[in-house]
């Protein structure tokens, strides 16, 4: 078998769903990481014709069996990863597969980033059970850093939905955590505890409904980490990237309602590199 490691390029395993139309999950992670010079390898948890935000009649293909088969093949190949990131899972079984993947592939220097997709706006998504929440807590305990929104932070800690971030951060199952989408007056941003530091990053709130902001942030954050920035320094850089994408998307409303126009910012960065 020909060698597949040692190329000098950072490699990331992305465990998430693939929405073939719409800007979320793997359809944003793959191009963003690639533009940052990272070899991005996808392990799809599901394949959808579109994402589920605002579309009707979408088609879903569950990939649970393929997740196990793909992982086993990569293990036989001896693949190694500098970063493993996770997003959407459709069942407790898939969360167990992801935990097994981390145990099999995460080495001492591998960064594990978990975006614990569970809910938003104060509610657990209807497709999830309490068993999924329990399995997600266990997965977060294997991570080096997690990026829940406020709702997900409350679900992971078993807290009331009005619990403040200062209370939530030390209760989360991972010592390094970025709570995303936190509102503060006319601003929106991030409250984090990273490498023992307490960090806040805020930007002006743009009042439009957006899909996939968490996926774009997590992708940019992973890319910044793999480009040599620590957990702390990568946060404002990823926040700046997302902020630029939001402003670009606002200019394209209402036609671009289904996701972030991240391509504009990638194009600018590619030209300036």
Residue ranges and their predicted role:
Residues 2-114, 118-126, 268:
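Conserved N-terminal subdomain of the carbohydrate kinase-like
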Residues 25, 29, 63-66, 70, ...:
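General structural feature for long, well-ordered alpha-helical segments within catalytic domains
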Residues 207-237:
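Short, small-residue alpha-helix embedded
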Residues 20, 199-212:
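Short pre-catalytic strand/loop immediately N-terminal to key active-site residues, enriched for Gly-Thr
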Residues 232-273:
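Charged C-terminal helix
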Residues 126-199, 208, 229-232:
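Conserved phosphate/ATP/ADP-binding segment of small-molecule kinases
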């Amino acid at each position: 078998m020909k060698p597949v490691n040692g190329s000098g390029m950072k490699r990331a395993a992305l465990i998430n769903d693939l929405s073939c139309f719409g800007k979320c999950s793997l359809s944003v992670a793959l191009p963003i990481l690639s533009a940052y010079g990272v070899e991005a390898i996808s392990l799809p948890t599901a394949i959808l014709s579109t994402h589920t935000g605002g579309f009707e009649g979408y088609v879903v293909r569950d990939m649970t069996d393929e997740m196990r088969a793909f992982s086993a093949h990569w293990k036989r190949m001896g693949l190694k990863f500098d970063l493993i990131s996770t997003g959407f899972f459709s069942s407790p079984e898939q969360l167990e597969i992801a935990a097994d993947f981390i145990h099999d592939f995460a080495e001492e220097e591998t960064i594990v980033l978990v975006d614990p997709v569970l809910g938003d706006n104060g509610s657990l998504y209807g497709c999830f059970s309490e068993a999924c929440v329990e399995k997600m807590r266990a997965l977060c305990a294997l991570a080096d850093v997690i990026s829940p929104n406020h709702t997900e932070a409350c679900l992971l800690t078993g807290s009331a939905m009005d619990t403040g971030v200062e209370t939530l951060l030390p209760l989360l199952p991972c010592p390094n955590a970025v709570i995303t989408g936190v509102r503060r007056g006319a601003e929106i941003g991030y409250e984090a505890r990273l490498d023992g530091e307490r960090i806040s990053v805020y930007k002006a709130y743009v009042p439009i409904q957006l899909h996939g902001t968490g996926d774009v942030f997590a992708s940019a954050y992973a890319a910044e980490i793999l480009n040599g920035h620590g957990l702390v320094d990568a946060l404002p850089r990823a926040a700046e990237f997302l902020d630029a994408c939001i402003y670009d998307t606002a200019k394209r409303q209402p036609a671009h309602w289904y996701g972030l126009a991240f391509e504009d910012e990638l194009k600018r960065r590619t030209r300036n590199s």
